[in-house]
Amino acid sequence: MAPSHPAFQFWIHLYLWCLLLMPAVLAQQGSHTHAEDRLFKHLFGGYNRWARPVPNTSDVVIVRFGLSIAQLIDVDEKNQMMTTNVWLKQEWNDYKLRWDPAEFGNITSLRVPSEMIWIPDIVLYNNADGEFAVTHMTKAHLFFTGTVHWVPPAIYKSSCSIDVTFFPFDQQNCKMKFGSWTYDKAKIDLEQMERTVDLKDYWESGEWAIINATGTYNSKKYDCCAEIYPDVTYYFVIRRLPLFYTINLIIPCLLISCLTVLVFYLPSECGEKITLCISVLLSLTVFLLLITEIIPSTSLVIPLIGEYLLFTMIFVTLSIVITVFVLNVHHRSPSTHNMPNWVRVALLGRVPRWLMMNRPLPPMELHGSPGLKLSPTYHWLETNMDAEEREETEEEEEEEEDENICMCAGLPDSSMGVLYGHGSLHLRAMGPEAKTPSQASEILLSPQIQKALEGVHYIADHLRSEDADSSVKEDWKYVAMVVDRIFLWLFIIVCFLGTIGLFLPPFLAGMI
């Protein structure tokens, strides 16, 4: 018994309809293929691809031209050229390629190899590598009205004048000039499809951004020929993306400059100022060797980053020279140099106040008692308290004056010295002529005590001399510190102004 399921019946009917319609479809396809074959024979049977597609030789072929950019591949600053991947949109009318669609199976368009038809010899005038014309001959799209639409792709290396003054914040203006190489304006004339470059299919570059891309129509008479030749020139305004160079060039330079400033904050006693300067200079030299390939190698102008690197190099070199001078001042002493009066007045008095530097007090003045200071007179063993007691006892000593004179008269004169009250020693010969009122307080001492007191005097003089030398040395050290502080602030200001000078010109030019 045959199956009666509705689905089975549906598939049976569909199969029968396919068998009935397939011959008609195949016949129609065969007719379309046959019509396309007939159309090819009709169009290219007696077609001459070398002749201009005009009925009269005086007619002008109007070529509508447009440009679409797919990728900005590279901008070579050293070789002064721009590499782009573009599509050349060209459209013209060929009266020999017209047909009636009704006679050829309603075929309204046809795609044919571009080698079979006449095409305009549009080339890139400012080419930089020898490939002036299109190398990949794609198919052209023909329409029954005779309109030919041809969009070949091409990779061009065009000459471009690169201005790297504001590198890496630079903006370039490159052009691509297209025109017929052999036909003048009386044979071929150009029209722009669009006034701007088509950016719909543009693939963004990681280094450059297209700010503007416009085209202009020009007619020019060259020295070689009497005819006028038309061209369409496209101007690309491109701006460099500075992030890569900011991270790899500018920030390291700023850090090196900061290290140079810190040299003047490092104390001279540590002995590492010159080491730090040389280390910074060596690091900058190695850094310059590494970035030689990054900076555009051109002698037309000095790039902004090159000026900043040169500024940093001079900056570091000057810091070394100044550091050597500061160390020389720091280690001066009274035995080698005398401090001029203007240095004492300016660098020990006025300049520290301007720099807000407060010199700490000496330890004797900071911690000592007022009653324990040494006196510069011959009473150097006395204290202020002793001096007051001495003044109080002067009257008592005057009363004992006669008795002391009597005691001195009975002692030998040749081997004794005298000691004034409270330890003041005078070496003199004693005799009858010494018995005067001014010598009433003299006390005779033995030679051993005299030698001991002479030794004490020598030690005291030596200590005073060392104290004076130490004071002068401390003054020289403080002068070195003041000079360090002067150049610290000076280098901070110069570093700040140099950094502002790096960013301000491109900012004012609208490139940042």
UniProtKB/Swiss-Prot annotation:
It comes from the Eukaryota. Disulfide bonds join 160-174, 224-225. It is a multi-pass membrane protein. It is found in: Synaptic cell membrane; Cell membrane. Glycans are attached at residues 56, 106, 212. Its main location: membrane. Residues 28-241 are extracellular. GO terms for biological process: cellular response to nicotine; modulation of inhibitory postsynaptic potential; regulation of synaptic plasticity; response to acetylcholine. One of its GO terms (cellular component) is postsynaptic membrane. One of its GO terms (molecular function) is acetylcholine-gated monoatomic cation-selective channel activity. The keyword Ribosomal protein does not apply. The chain crosses the membrane at residues 242-266, 274-292, 308-329, 486-504. Pfam families: Neur_chan_LBD (PF02931), Neur_chan_memb (PF02932). Residues 1-27 form the signal peptide. Residues 330-485 are cytoplasmic. Keywords: Cell membrane, Disulfide bond, Glycoprotein, Ion channel, Ion transport, Ligand-gated ion channel, Membrane, Receptor, Signal, Synapse, Transmembrane, Transmembrane helix, Transport. It catalyses: Ca(2+)(in) = Ca(2+)(out); K(+)(in) = K(+)(out); Na(+)(in) = Na(+)(out). InterPro entries: Neur_chan_lig-bd (IPR006202), Neur_chan_lig-bd_sf (IPR036734), Neur_channel (IPR006201), Neuro-gated_channel_TM_sf (IPR036719), Neuro_actylchol_rec (IPR038050), Neurotrans-gated_channel_TM (IPR006029), Neurotransmitter_ion_chnl_CS (IPR018000), Nicotinic_acetylcholine_rcpt (IPR002394). Belongs to the ligand-gated ion channel (TC 1.A.9) family. Acetylcholine receptor (TC 1.A.9.1) subfamily. Alpha-2/CHRNA2 sub-subfamily. Neuronal AChR is composed of two different types of subunits: alpha and non-alpha (beta). CHRNA2/alpha-2 subunit can be combined to CHRNB2/beta-2 or CHRNB4/beta-4 to give rise to functional receptors. Both CHRNA2:CHRNB2 and CHRNA2:CHRNB4 nAChR complexes are heteropentamers with two subtypes: LS (low agonist sensitivity) with a (CHRNA2)3:(CHRNB2/4)2 and HS (high agonist sensitivity) with a (CHRNA2)2:(CHRNB2/4)3 stoichiometries; the subtypes differ in their subunit binding interfaces which are involved in ligand binding. Component of neuronal acetylcholine receptors (nAChRs) that function as pentameric, ligand-gated cation channels with high calcium permeability among other activities. nAChRs are excitatory neurotrasnmitter receptors formed by a collection of nAChR subunits known to mediate synaptic transmission in the nervous system and the neuromuscular junction. Each nAchR subunit confers differential attributes to channel properties, including activation, deactivation and desensitization kinetics, pH sensitivity, cation permeability, and binding to allosteric modulators. This is Neuronal acetylcholine receptor subunit alpha-2.
